[in-house]
Amino acid sequence: MNKAYYGRKWLLQVACNDGSVLEIGEDGISEETPLKVTFDVNYPGYQGWYFSEFNIWNLTSDWQQKIIGEGSEIWFYAGYKEGNYGLLFSGKVFQPFLTREGVVNYKLTLMCMDGDRLFKDNFISTNMPAGYTESQLVNAIAAQAFTPIPVNKITERLAPSQLVRKSTIFASPDVPIREVVRNNIDSYLYMREGKLNIVDVNESDSSQEPLGINSKTGLVGTPQQTDFGINFRVLLNPVIGITNPPMEVKVDLSKVNIAMQRAVLGRPVSVVDQTGWFKVGGVRHFGDSRGNEWYTDVTGYALSGKTPANLTVPLYLQRASSN
């Protein structure tokens, strides 16, 4: 019997601004029952910062007051005792609040953000000499921002041409970086674990085999066809995520039925890529440490044909709140 999906394992770490660190978790071995925790880690698409929500029940009042204080950071790991286990979220707590449920239960909700250094309370004031490239511009902005922004990877497919005029930048860091992305077709800006990425969605990592998706690897229910590819759910898998270049998965269509789109008059229906190969364009991890939920929802798009457009801020917020 495959034990890769048995024995839940998770760890929630919260670093408070006074230097203390709260750790709550379950290692899948001991019989001790930790506090109830629910999580919703949502990366609905490229282009933007990301919000996640964590709920903790019945913390001591001392820890509640420490975490409610400004400046807490959070890390969340989840997976299985004998299977995949890894970091799902790393970011800042931007809104904590306490609610009472019933007579004796208190729930601490932590609204968290990944990407605050790019979009929140940051600024860049610098001059770029003539002859710089767009890649050099992005790296300079990240390094010279009031709060420096770590850079993970910038696609090599950005326009290599040198700009003939010098320029002065006096703005929030995301403004000139978004302009670079708009000037490069199929390029996306996103933050992951606090690090800046610019990815070209047509790139692929030839050194990595696509992740197989079938009933033996945790597929739950029936994948749903979309305009761009398919959406599907698997048992919680920290391996699946927003990556640079985009992660590829292979759905075994010989053994998996797909719920087809319903035909609408005047609207063409897409054809599912029969190779079963898709790129991961959005991921949502969610679960309940004492409940049944322990899943990963994936948005996949075909390797050929249409690709999703960059998410605007209003559209991103709409996608994030709808899950």
Residue ranges: model-predicted function:
Residues 37-67, 202-323:
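An acidic/polar, Gly/Ser/Thr-rich interaction patch typically located in mid-to-C-terminal regions
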Residues 67-69, 82, 86, 127-135, ...:
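Solvent-exposed, acidic/flexible segments
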Residues 20-29, 151-154, 159-160, 210, ...:
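Acidic Ser/Thr/Pro-rich low-complexity disordered segments
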Residues 80-82, 190, 212-215:
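Acidic/polar residues at beta-strand termini and the immediately following turn/coil
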Residues 1-6, 60, 80-82, 138, ...:
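Compositionally biased, intrinsically disordered low-complexity segments enriched in polar/Pro/Gly
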Residues 89, 194, 276:
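Residues that flank catalytic or metal-binding motifs in active/ligand-binding sites
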Residues 1-111, 280-283:
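Assembly/oligomerization scaffold segments
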Residues 103-211:
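Charged- and aromatic-enriched interaction segments used to assemble
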